[in-house]
Design a protein with these regions (language model features):
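Active-site and donor-binding regions of nucleotide-sugar-utilizing enzymes
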Residues: 1-2, 7-17, 56-147
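Conserved nucleotide-sugar phosphate-binding/catalytic loop shared by glycosyltransferases and other
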Residues: 23-72, 76
Length: 147
């Protein structure tokens, strides 16, 4: 899950390592936060983006953007995988590609928080890269430090 150019750059090696593995089939999902910049980085690396979750107006407020990412991720999971709230996946579901093994998010952006929360609500394990870096000031940077 990538939202910003720095996230895309930092996750390239993770995406490539997963792609080289015999055990995983990484699907790159963009939250749409920095759509063009993320797409440019992925294009340079030869990595395809499966879906962009938010393509709304840049004038939309933060709550609307977070809600859009969460709703679109839920829709994507229901369409691409057998992710439904009425059943618990098992190991066979993951091995057969019917359920994601995990969602990897990076950093402290609101789009990363939205994607992680949506995955958590669907029972998908969340791996958080670069978690825990703090400034100690809840208002700076805003809203990332609160996320």
């Amino acid at each position: 899950m990538v939202g910003t150019r720095p996230e895309a750059i930092k996750l390239l090696s993770v995406i490539r390592a997963l792609d080289a593995s015999a055990y995983y089939e990484p699907l790159v999902v963009s939250t749409g936060q920095h759509y063009k910049m993320v797409q440019d980085i992925l294009d340079l690396a030869g990595i395809a983006c499966e879906v962009t979750l938010w393509s709304g107006s840049r004038q939309a407020n933060l709550n609307a953007r977070v809600a859009s990412v969460m709703e679109r991720f839920e829709d994507f999971c229901a369409e691409r995988f057998e992710v439904h709230s009425d059943r618990t996946p098992n190991e066979e579901d993951v091995l057969q590609g019917r359920f994601p093994a995990a969602v990897i998010v990076h950093g402290d952006t609101s789009s990363a928080m939205a994607a992680a929360l949506s995955a958590f609500h669907k029972g998908i394990p969340v791996m958080h890269v670069e978690a825990g870096l703090r400034t100690g000031d809840i208002r700076s940077p805003f809203p990332e430090e609160m996320n």
